[in-house]
């Protein structure tokens, strides 16, 4: 019997809860690169995991502040297209509670169009593009 498949969980950090929602849906192993203190060693381990995982998943949400994950998904879709999976979620929630409750963040129309084009580019390169975590889990669990 072969080793269990493994997915690299790349994409939006910034206290986004997408990983917490996806992990219970997975029937395969995963590498979560989120750490409290990002160091050079963490970056080296992340590159190592991206290279050896069966799938490299990048989920982008409106809590994204940097753009490096976009570069990573395009890089992986060129270098490892059959292992690259991209998903962007239209909304995310800020963990902090304010007097109105949980703060919902969304992408504006131009950002949504741009991210849709990123997804289509990933597909043209041979990768997969999904719009929900349920679709992502379905693909990862069955391939």
Language-model regions, residue ranges each:
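Conserved catalytic or regulatory cores that recognize and/or transform ribose-phosphate-containing ligands
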Residues: 1-143
